[in-house]
Amino acid sequence: VEAEGCYVIPGLVDIHFHGCVRHDMCDGTEESIQALADYEAANGVLAICPATMTIPEEELFQAMKAAKGHKNGKGADLVGINMEGPFINKEKKGAQKEEDIKLADVELFHKLQEAAGGLIKLVDLAPETEGAMDFINQVKDEVHVSIAHTMADYDTASEAIRRGADHITHLYNAMPPLNHREPGVIGAARDSDCYVELICDGVHIHPSCVRATFEMFTDKRIVLISDSMMATGMEDGQYELGGQPVTVVGNVATLTEGGAIAGSATNLMDCMRTVVKEMHIPF
């Protein structure tokens, strides 16, 4: 291999992405999981923890069963599942389908975990919703709990972290902004040991904010993610995310109805290049 003038780095790990090359984790098929694994490996990502969406319960179970049946060996290794929905706040649903949003449910989670063969490594929730704090108490020792799609204030987020939540899903996105009198989830995360996800595709977060975030959290607590959807690796056009139509132009993916950002169309390796080359974060 001729590598003069290049960097040689370990393979990346993407703990939060939905799809690529017209396939999605929520398809619930071996074909789609293998397509994700192949594309990611070809783009420098050697371990994947794809995310599910807020979708009908039967479809969620099918996605879990498909993951359980997948055999690693070709492409990136499937090392877990990030369960992004359905335990979120409707006010911050983003590109998630409102009709499938549910209150945090320990029994449902355990059934999904059984269907997945224990592969769920992250479960996301809005801590201000009914039953969420009790949910954290009951599952914190068996799965990482991530604060996501939330309207939580500083005190509520801090209490969730005290109870065992140790991760923040796509910091800044689908949560109240940092305010000097109402620091919210972002402030609570800063004052804790939580890991925080950043979508650094150049669309979701302004470069100045990314640089400030690295100053606040350091690279020891920041997890770069792609949050990519099925248009990644494809041409512009019409796609789908969580059962909703998505329009993709360049690297910008938005819901066709409403215009909300609907994941990214950028793989993790390209996100990392953007962070280093365009946002000037030291490599």
Feature-to-residue mapping (PLM):
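Conserved, mostly hydrophobic/aromatic
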Residues: 5, 16, 40, 83, ...
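Divalent metal-dependent hydrolysis catalytic cores, especially in the metallo-beta-lactamase
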Residues: 18, 34-63, 76-89, 116-128, ...
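His/Asp/Glu-enriched, well-ordered alpha-helical/loop segment
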Residues: 188-198, 214-226, 231-283
